[in-house]
């Protein structure tokens, strides 16, 4: 039997960088998908952080 190929689209978690440094309780995380072939580097997106009430940089975590 042939093996099932892994898909190119994978699920990734984005975590706020400013919130981690601020020391406030809680965390801001988003789950999204990316195409493994087109985007080989880690994602960095500006997303809304409801705790800090502003747009902040969210980076992909393992």
Curated annotation (Swiss-Prot):
Alphabetized Pfam families for the sequence: Ribosomal_L33 (PF00471)
Organism annotation: Parabacteroides distasonis (strain ATCC 8503 / DSM 20701 / CIP 104284 / JCM 5825 / NCTC 11152)
Identification of the protein by name: Large ribosomal subunit protein bL33
Family: Belongs to the bacterial ribosomal protein bL33 family.
GO BP of this protein: translation
Gene: rpmG
InterPro entries named among the record's database cross-references: Ribosomal_bL33, Ribosomal_bL33_sf, Ribosomal_zn-bd
Entry superkingdom: Bacteria
A GO CC term attached to the entry: ribosome
Source organism phylogeny: Bacteria, Pseudomonadati, Bacteroidota, Bacteroidia, Bacteroidales
GO molecular function, a single term: structural constituent of ribosome
Keywords linked to the UniProt accession: Ribonucleoprotein, Ribosomal protein
């Amino acid at each position: 039997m042939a093996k099932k190929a892994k898909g190119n689209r994978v699920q990734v978690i984005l975590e706020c960088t400013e919130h981690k440094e601020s020391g406030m309780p809680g965390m801001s995380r988003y789950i999204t998908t990316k195409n493994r072939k087109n985007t080989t580097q880690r994602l960095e997106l500006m997303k809304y952080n409801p705790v800090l009430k502003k747009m902040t940089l969210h980076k992909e975590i393992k």
